[in-house]
């Protein structure tokens, strides 16, 4: 939102993430009228998908490799054409496995980040 988006919808499986998202937005001067944060599983909850209001432009997953591998094929249909899937929290010993799973799910890894034994991938 600070980079120009008009609005945002965020969903996290962890209810604590909702409160943290609201706190972080407030610290950055972003009013609640510009975004919605929900707890739940957008992959299995049709009501959350409806509230999302269409495909996502950005999906972020900062979580362990096994979850990213399982999530990759399921999240693809929820994304708009050209959308970004940003994955992080990938330990170096699993990076190639995760990259392979992303590519097998139809993603193209456009950028790779590496820091202190951890990887991130920016995919489309």
Model-flagged regions — what are they?
Residues 90-124:
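Active-site capping/gating segments
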């Amino acid at each position: 939102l600070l980079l120009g988006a008009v609005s945002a919808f965020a969903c996290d499986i962890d209810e604590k993430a909702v409160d943290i998202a609201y706190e972080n937005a407030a610290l950055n001067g972003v009013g609640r009228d510009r975004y919605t944060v929900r707890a739940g599983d957008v992959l299995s909850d049709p009501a959350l998908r409806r509230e999302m209001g269409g495909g996502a432009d950005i999906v972020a997953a900062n979580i362990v490799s096994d979850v990213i591998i399982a999530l990759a094929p399921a999240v693809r249909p929820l994304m708009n054409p050209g959308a970004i899937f940003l994955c992080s929290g990938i330990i170096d010993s699993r990076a190639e496995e995760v990259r392979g799973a992303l590519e097998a799910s139809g993603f193209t890894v456009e950028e790779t980040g590496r820091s202190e034994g951890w990887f991130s991938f920016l995919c489309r």
